[in-house]
Amino acid sequence: MHKKVLVVDSDYFFVEFLSQLLTKRGYEVLKAYNGKEGIARLEDDTVDILFSDLVLPKVDGPQFFKFIRNKYNGNPFPLVALSGIMIEQLGSLNEIGADYFIAKGPIDQLTIKLNEFITEIETRPFSPPEDKKVLATGSVFPRRDAMELLNALQFHQAVIECAAAGIIIVDSDTRIINANRTALEIIGKRSVEVLNCPVADLFVNAERADLVEGLKLVKRQVDIKKYSFYATLNSRVIGTLISSIGLKSEFVGWIVVLQPALRND
């Protein structure tokens, strides 16, 4: 039986390159183009190794790796971070959650490096290396523009994560792609339990109807900026506020804000 590999990257051509390399080595390759698709793939299949970029749409790389760790209670199979911004992450490899780290580079050199790497992990039992290091195709150095991009992304994620209100980011198919720690505390669930789950699953039947009405309303009528209602979540009355997310004049999802109701509300 062929071993299965999951490749997750938003770059279609890189996914095809890596898929062809792995197929030639006898692997069955599953593909995903964002972190949310990667989670969905793991719900339907089991894999023997995973390659993922760090900068991913919807659910980013570190969040994706964290999800896998929680879902499989530790070290289920080799998790390989393969990214063009790996060198810029040298100071925070422990925070990424992968077992191995490979920097993207020229395809001809990267092909050699990947074949050497795969041969190595095929010939010995999987045991996560104690020392975290980046495999690179040559002399590479951090780039200022990449560092600035990472800092901006991390800042915006920190704003969401540290907000006093619960914030849930919902994709256009109504599935959850992010929930900050306040939201997780309010609903009494872990991140692994809510990522890629329908947001309606958080609410009981009567309040689910309010949620669905709000989702539809703010999507269809752009002049309506928010829709609010009260819900009982984890035995507490929670003020729930829904607004739509627009990107380049296109609807891409919703923000659901959760705030425990005050006594005089």
Please describe what each predicted stretch is.
Residues 112-113, 119-163:
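CheY-like receiver
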Residues 15, 56-57:
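The feature encodes the CheY-like receiver
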Residues 63, 70, 75, 84-103, ...:
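Alpha4 helix (beta4-alpha4-beta5 surface) of REC/receiver domains from two-component response regulators
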Residues 11-33, 37:
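Two-component/phosphorelay signaling modules centered on CheY-like receiver
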Residues 45-51, 56:
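Active-site beta3 strand of CheY-like receiver
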Residues 146-187, 192:
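Sensory modules in modular signal-transduction proteins
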Residues 203-234:
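Terminal output helix/cap of sensory domains in signal transduction proteins
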Residues 33-37, 60-66:
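Acidic catalytic/metal-coordinating carboxylates
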